[in-house]
Amino acid sequence: MKQLKPNSKYLLFGQALSFMGDYCVLPALLILSTYYHDYWVTSGVIAVRSIPMVFQPFLGVLVDRLDRVKIMLWTDVIRGVIFLGLTFLPKGEYPLLFLALLFVSYGSGVFFNPARLAVMSSLEADIKNINTLFAKATTISIIVGAAAGGLFLLGGSVELAVAFNGVTYLVSAFFISRIKLQYVPIQSENVREAFQSFKEGLKEIKTNAFVLNAMFTMITMALLWGVVYSYFPIVSRFLGDGEIGNFLLTFCIGFGGFIGAALVSKWGFNNNKGLMYFTVLSIVSLALFLFTPIFAVSVIAAILFFIAMEYGEVLAKVKVQENAANQIQGRIFSVAEASIGLCIAVGSMLINIVDAAVIMAFIVLLVSGLFLHTKLVNKSFSERNNESEQIHL
């Protein structure tokens, strides 16, 4: 940390605080959505968080033509003002305004990540250090953010958690305003070329079995994430008035992800042992989460679920990185980013359409299909490695 240059420190401090606020406010928003007594509003909260991701792959065209630091600065200011404004909205009233404000906030937020990644690439010698520190800060921020939200709720006001998120965005904007980078506009591809790149990513996914499997994994996990998020308010009711439970379940995201990241090297890549762990954990944890009336069991199930999701996420990314040409990987991840946003939204809507038993049956079929496809791909990977070894001999 001491070796980082000022620009790198400002970016890291601002983003750690901002991320902390994100995971402090998520359960708070789910709690506020329950005051509308309509689960379509709860699903709407998840949808307006995820649907803007569909457009993120095409925003690099605009980001490359503008000052990235200013994009980050004004995005955080807009988000901060909106979240502070949400605290003045009466509970349970004006649902469309509630969702519209969230959509504007998260919609503006999709400009932030491409700009942040571009700024990070300008940090030269610090780029490896800040990427490593950012990954560590992400997990810690989820845990601390959820804990802070829980404390605000115990203090008597869920609105404080929402206000805290607004403040973290404004503090992040302050740090970003201190970043001193020379603005150099880049004439990147136009919108038509961006769509062409997107189509090339789709073509690679369809013709490369390994990349297709990675995409299948990411889409499956996104649907599962949407389902789990939508059930947070229901499961939380098994603990007191249900509000503090949302923060405890959000804490599980960070805790489970931390354990999952640590288990990746032990479970391995492209082998049936890790695949079996992922499949069993995904199905069993979701079944427990959806059907148990005991909150302590739900917490354990949530931790197991997020362990599986972290493992699956790493596996999917590595599968793309190992089996696709470097120049096409960005296009593949662009397609993945858009698909993930759409699938989280779809998963969150299922609670309003079918009951838990039907959702669980769908999940079992989906994860089982992924298991079979991955097993075939792992076999191909093993055969390819054996052939490569024989050639070298």
Swiss-Prot record:
<feature type="transmembrane region" description="Helical">
    <location>
        <begin position="244"/>
        <end position="264"/>
    </location>
</feature>
<comment type="similarity">
    <text>Belongs to the major facilitator superfamily.</text>
</comment>
<dbReference type="InterPro" id="IPR036259">
    <property type="entry name" value="MFS_trans_sf"/>
</dbReference>
<keyword id="KW-0812">Transmembrane</keyword>
<dbReference type="GO" id="GO:0022857">
    <property type="term" value="F:transmembrane transporter activity"/>
</dbReference>
<feature type="transmembrane region" description="Helical">
    <location>
        <begin position="353"/>
        <end position="373"/>
    </location>
</feature>
<keyword id="KW-0472">Membrane</keyword>
<feature type="transmembrane region" description="Helical">
    <location>
        <begin position="287"/>
        <end position="307"/>
    </location>
</feature>
<feature type="transmembrane region" description="Helical">
    <location>
        <begin position="43"/>
        <end position="63"/>
    </location>
</feature>
<feature type="transmembrane region" description="Helical">
    <location>
        <begin position="133"/>
        <end position="155"/>
    </location>
</feature>
<dbReference type="GO" id="GO:0005886">
    <property type="term" value="C:plasma membrane"/>
</dbReference>
<feature type="transmembrane region" description="Helical">
    <location>
        <begin position="160"/>
        <end position="177"/>
    </location>
</feature>
<protein>
    <recommendedName>
        <fullName>Putative bacilysin exporter BacE</fullName>
    </recommendedName>
</protein>
<dbReference type="InterPro" id="IPR011701">
    <property type="entry name" value="MFS"/>
</dbReference>
<keyword id="KW-1003">Cell membrane</keyword>
<dbReference type="Pfam" id="PF07690">
    <property type="entry name" value="MFS_1"/>
</dbReference>
<dbReference type="InterPro" id="IPR022324">
    <property type="entry name" value="Bacilysin_exporter_BacE_put"/>
</dbReference>
<feature type="transmembrane region" description="Helical">
    <location>
        <begin position="69"/>
        <end position="89"/>
    </location>
</feature>
<keyword id="KW-1133">Transmembrane helix</keyword>
<keyword id="KW-0813">Transport</keyword>
<feature type="transmembrane region" description="Helical">
    <location>
        <begin position="215"/>
        <end position="235"/>
    </location>
</feature>
<feature type="transmembrane region" description="Helical">
    <location>
        <begin position="11"/>
        <end position="31"/>
    </location>
</feature>
<feature type="transmembrane region" description="Helical">
    <location>
        <begin position="92"/>
        <end position="112"/>
    </location>
</feature>
<comment type="function">
    <text>Part of the bacilysin biosynthesis operon. May be involved in self-resistance to bacilysin by permitting efflux of this antibiotic.</text>
</comment>
